[in-house]
Structures are given as structure tokens and as C-alpha cells.
């Protein structure tokens, strides 16, 4: 398997040249565009990686899956989905247009920025610090890594350049869609996106989802089978931004990407996959990472469809 993964990485490394580093968060531009790595955790206990799988990067939008799970655990699925929809959108992940044209004014789904900000606002805690600590601890639990920390530089960079997210949040506030102190909610959102992970962490997270909400390494149930099914369904329809339909057709695996270059994927009852490749396509997904996923899916027949 290791030789197979190494060949996948080398065969697809050429695609990094066709992408760009995320530029709207200055700190993310410091990444090495050439990096590409993959890690796989199978449900029968095998772990194998190739390329830059142990290199740290920020989780970015993959954190939206974590906060969605936490919000559902805190509030129940009915309350969460009364506030945010589950419909895919053809607009970009930070679009304001989609909020304006929707009669209910609630965000389309929890994987676009507006929906994720609203989801974060539903997480319980007596203070912003307590809420962040809960997100951090939950992230450590689902990745099996107690050493995950906040990248302070990326957090400050996000905070400094997050005007589009502020616009989304205040637009929702003006329509009565979101409650609470907007500055505190956004600060929490910027922090959750700035947690440092590697491809191995993402693969272990994916393995938990592939295992119907149970951590494969210790048998602990983190979320119910039903919540896990909902999460994976939303990942299929909305997880790869406005490229989700194409990804479902050609690759067919529940996955979530982030502009830090990560892809977290879950092949039900088989494996979790973590990818790192910070060179992005025009949708904000890892360009070489997506090619790796396509080859992996075809070679191992991983599509759920």
C-alpha cells in the first residue's frame, strides 16, 4: 500500500503548478506550494502515509464538520437545521448573494461560511474561552491527537483580513438569523479555522466518520450513527464548496476541504483519508489533492455510488 500511495503522490505532484496558494489570508501564502501528502487509516487498524503527510497546516473549513457535530450534540439536529439549511449552493463559500436571495435569509448549508458562522454561534459555553476549549478538546478527540494547538499567527491574520466574514455575520444579524455578540462569534470562528493539523489527523477524523461515529482506535462512540449519517450526507452534497457535484460524480467519497490545503474524507466502513496540498484550484480545493483522491477512488473502487 505504501508504494501505491507514493506513486499516487509522485504521479500527481505535477498538478501543484496549476494552482495557487490562498492569498486572501496572508499567512497562508507562506506555505510551500510543492507540498503534497496523503495518509490512510483503515478500520481494521492499518495506517500508512506518503509525501508530506506529517507537515502541519491549519484546518480551515474542515473545522466546520467539527463545529456542526458539536452544535448538534448541544442543541439537537432539529434546532440546528431550523437555523441553517442543508441545500447545496452553486455560489462560492463566502458569497453574500446566496443569503440575500433566499426568502428565509438562513444560510444554505453549514459548509459555506455564513452557515458555519451560525453553527459556531450555537455552541454552548459560559464564555468565549470555554467554547473554544470545547472545540479544541473535541478536535483532539476526533483526531486522536492531544497535541493539536491554535496557530496564533494564522488566527491573527484571519482576524485582520476577515471583513467578508464580518459582512456575512452582520447581514445575518440584521435579518434576525443569528443571535449573540457578533465579534465574539467571529473570534471563535477565526480560532476554530486556525487549529493546526496534519494529514494523519484528518485521516483519523475521517476514520471515525467511516466507522459510524465510533473512534476505531479505542471503540468510544463520539456521535450517534444518525448524526454521522447526516454529516457524511452534507459532506457529499456541500463539502467541496461549489465543486461538490463534480467531486461526487468523479470521486464519490464524502469529503471536506479547507483552503489550508487539507481534504478529510470518509469511505463508509472502510477507511479515513487525509490529504495535504496547499496549491488550490479556483474553487478553493487542493488541486493535486483532488487528483490524488480521484486516482485513489478509481484504483480501490471507493465510490459510494
UniProtKB/Swiss-Prot annotation:
HAMAP family: Glutaminase (MF_00313). This is Glutaminase 2. Belongs to the glutaminase family. It comes from Clostridium perfringens (strain 13 / Type A). It catalyses: L-glutamine + H2O = L-glutamate + NH4(+). Homotetramer. One of its GO terms (molecular function) is glutaminase activity. The gene is glsA2. Substrate binds at residues 61, 113, 158, 165, 189, 241, 259. Keywords: Hydrolase.
